[in-house]
């Protein structure tokens, strides 16, 4: 059973320097926090990401300081040691990141824990892990933000998985200002985005539009 307030999952930014460029990363995050994102996951991974652990730690510390200023949860993707060193608010892991030992250790340290799922079997397996707080399901639509993205699930499958899950579901993958309302209507707890914010011409306006579906249906999430 999850121990977190589902509201923190509503407008969930996932980003690293590979999504913004190094110079723009912190200013974009600052704008996004000021405009009302509810959660931030530091995911610095893949081509054009930071080349050393020391640099990654430095950017993560600065991102964490911004998140604390705005009282927004700061989640680390995959890197348990970094999450523990920084006393991050949470850890998110994928199916290929040796998830269960990391989730258990993270929970022992009081961190929020999230796991990426793509199949019904992965969701059912998540029910056996009491240390897990939420799951990320995706990609929902085609996306260019992740090189290793799997086949898109679509809205009907997302709704079915949300009903199957005993935990709050965060949708991710190809979510945009145009389709976020449809995503919210599936009953998910929130939507995680990368380019919808990092590539937005007007970040405050983009976040206002991403927030809208949750504000108009407050309290109706996770319906069956």
From Swiss-Prot:
Residues annotated for 4-amino-2-methyl-5-(diphosphooxymethyl)pyrimidine binding in this entry: 41-45, 77, 116, 146
Enzyme class (EC, first level): transferase
Gene Ontology biological-process entries: thiamine biosynthetic process; thiamine diphosphate biosynthetic process
Amino-acid positions noted as binding 2-[(2R,5Z)-2-carboxy-4-methylthiazol-5(2H)-ylidene]ethyl phosphate in the UniProt annotation, renumbered to this chain: 143-145, 174, 194-195
Catalyzed reactions: 2-[(2R,5Z)-2-carboxy-4-methylthiazol-5(2H)-ylidene]ethyl phosphate + 4-amino-2-methyl-5-(diphosphooxymethyl)pyrimidine + 2 H(+) = thiamine phosphate + CO2 + diphosphate; 2-(2-carboxy-4-methylthiazol-5-yl)ethyl phosphate + 4-amino-2-methyl-5-(diphosphooxymethyl)pyrimidine + 2 H(+) = thiamine phosphate + CO2 + diphosphate; 4-methyl-5-(2-phosphooxyethyl)-thiazole + 4-amino-2-methyl-5-(diphosphooxymethyl)pyrimidine + H(+) = thiamine phosphate + diphosphate
Keyword Magnesium tagged: yes
Cofactor(s) recorded in Swiss-Prot or TrEMBL: Mg(2+)
Biological pathway: Cofactor biosynthesis; thiamine diphosphate biosynthesis; thiamine phosphate from 4-amino-2-methyl-5-diphosphomethylpyrimidine and 4-methyl-5-(2-phosphoethyl)-thiazole: step 1/1
Coiled coil stretches, renumbered: none
Binding site for Mg(2+): 78, 97
GO molecular function: magnesium ion binding; thiamine-phosphate diphosphorylase activity
Annotated Gene Ontology cellular component terms: cytoplasm
Keywords: Magnesium, Metal-binding, Thiamine biosynthesis, Transferase
Family: Belongs to the thiamine-phosphate synthase family.
Function field: Condenses 4-methyl-5-(beta-hydroxyethyl)thiazole monophosphate (THZ-P) and 2-methyl-4-amino-5-hydroxymethyl pyrimidine pyrophosphate (HMP-PP) to form thiamine monophosphate (TMP).
Name listed for the protein in its UniProt record: Thiamine-phosphate synthase
Source organism per UniProt: Latilactobacillus sakei subsp. sakei (strain 23K) (Lactobacillus sakei subsp. sakei)
Gene: thiE
């Amino acid at each position: 059973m999850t121990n977190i307030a589902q509201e923190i999952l509503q407008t969930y930014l996932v980003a690293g320097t590979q999504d913004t460029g190094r110079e723009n990363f912190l200013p974009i995050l600052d704008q996004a926090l000021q405009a009302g994102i509810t959660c931030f996951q530091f995911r610095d991974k893949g081509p054009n990401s930071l080349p050393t652990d020391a640099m990654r730690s430095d950017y993560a510390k600065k991102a964490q300081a911004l998140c604390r200023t705005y009282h927004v949860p700061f989640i680390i993707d995959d890197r348990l040691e970094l999450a523990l060193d920084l006393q991050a608010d949470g850890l998110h892991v994928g199916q290929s990141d040796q998830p269960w030992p990391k989730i258990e250790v993270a929970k022992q340290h009081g961190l929020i824990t999230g796991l990426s799922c793509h199949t019904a079997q992965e969701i059912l397996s998540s029910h056996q892990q009491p240390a897990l707080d939420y799951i990320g399901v995706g990609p929902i639509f085609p996306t260019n933000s992740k090189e290793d993205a799997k086949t898109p699930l679509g809205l009907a499958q997302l709704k079915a998985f949300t009903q199957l899950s005993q935990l709050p579901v965060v949708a991710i993958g190809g979510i945009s200002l145009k389709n976020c309302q449809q995503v919210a209507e599936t009953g998910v707890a929130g939507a995680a985005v990368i380019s919808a914010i990092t590539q937005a011409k007007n970040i405050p306006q983009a976040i206002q539009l991403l927030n809208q579906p949750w504000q108009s249906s407050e309290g109706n999430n996770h319906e069956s």
